[in-house]
Amino acid sequence: MSRRTEIDVRPITEAEFPDWNRALNTGFLRPPAVAEEQLEARRNEFVPGRSLGAFDGDRCVATFRSFDQELTAVGGGLVRADAVSNVTVTATHRRRGLLTRMMAQDLAAAKERGDVVATLIAAEYRIYGRYGFGPATSMTEWAVDVPRAGLDPRWAAPEDGGRIDLVDGADVRRLGPELHERLRRAQPGAVSRTELWWRYRTGVIDWNGSPWTEPCYALYRSADGEVEGMASYRTDDRWGDAKQPLNTATVDWLLAVTPAAERALWHYLCSIDWVQTVKSGWRSPDDLLPHLLPDPRAARITTQADWLWVRILDVARALEARTYEGQGSVVLEVVDRGGLTGGRWRLEAGPDGASCAPTTESAHFVLDVGDLAALWLGDESAVRLAALGRVREERAGAARVVDALLRTSRRPWCPDMF
């Protein structure tokens, strides 16, 4: 067993990728060895300098990967993000500070590049707060009891003059990216997708080693013929003992840029013959789905959890990138144990724009950089955090001022796992 000081944390070379991938699979409790085809598919994600490994001798025992991403702020502003993924530490090498070393190295490089934030989807809640991340969006999954929903079983087409067609993977790759761009530029919390995302999700590339099964793809066009919505879903072909259909339609993803498209796609999914249950996939916690049904109680929440975590790397640029419905000012003291963006900042904000600059004035509101991340996209409440003792008012009423500036009328949402 090597001494802890001998474990080397560094960017991997392309030649080390197979060993890095073995360590990644081990950390995720998957079979360590994979077929050569799957390994080659995973190489598509390799970017020199952005995949880190911890090496005990010549064996990789921890993994970390990041890549360039854009995140949509409140109001539609796009900020540069360092997306963190593939974080593992082999069970034999835990509690040695390997993740801390990899995270520090990556965040320092992201700060140097000029990234405004870092992002990740946290597998475990208690890990990432220590690095300045905070839960900035959440997600909800619903299961719809179709017979109870109250929709007309004779439904055959959208009432608005639009239409729904079933398409194939080539159509999804052709039409999906532009549709997603329209959605994500209007949806705070949404992130950019690469061409690889679409190739992975339509079976062009085998990225997880499982046999590819083609899903169904439903496309919504408005009465004017414009593509405004798309969904990918699978059915399970399940029947009961009395020869009654008990099928479930599970949604992989659903994109809609208008309420009409969203309504039409959900109504279509809930009208498929033999389908008794529709599982929604990852949706916004204030998604319209339940209220698109005559009986909203037919949509039962099955999962509700934090989703996208954000680590602010530049307080001023992050706060200036978003819009504000209210008018006001507040002096924030941001505590950053990572030393990347702490300090005291005066935020002056209103509907016409915002400025955020360092100040020597007395603080009105003191908070950790992770809690600022939770507030930044508007999903969390400063008053709520104050009640929990996680933030501190230095001026009475400061939490209400922060909420008046940062809270939003619709909640942020990230549709993606990465």
UniProtKB/Swiss-Prot annotation:
Gene3D superfamilies for the chain: 3.40.630.30, SCP2 sterol-binding domain
Amino acids binding acetyl-CoA: 87-89, 95-100
Active-site residues, Swiss-Prot/TrEMBL: 128, 418
Gene Ontology biological-process entries: aminoglycoside antibiotic catabolic process
Keywords: Acyltransferase, Transferase
PROSITE patterns assigned: GNAT
GO MF annotations in UniProt: aminoglycoside N-acetyltransferase activity
Acyltransferase keyword on record: yes
Pfam families referenced in this protein's UniProt entry, alphabetically: Acetyltransf_17, Acetyltransf_9, SCP2_2
Subunit field text: Homohexamer; trimer of dimers.
Similarity field: Belongs to the acetyltransferase Eis family.
UniProt name for this protein: Uncharacterized N-acetyltransferase SCO4186
Native source organism of the sequence: Streptomyces coelicolor (strain ATCC BAA-471 / A3(2) / M145)
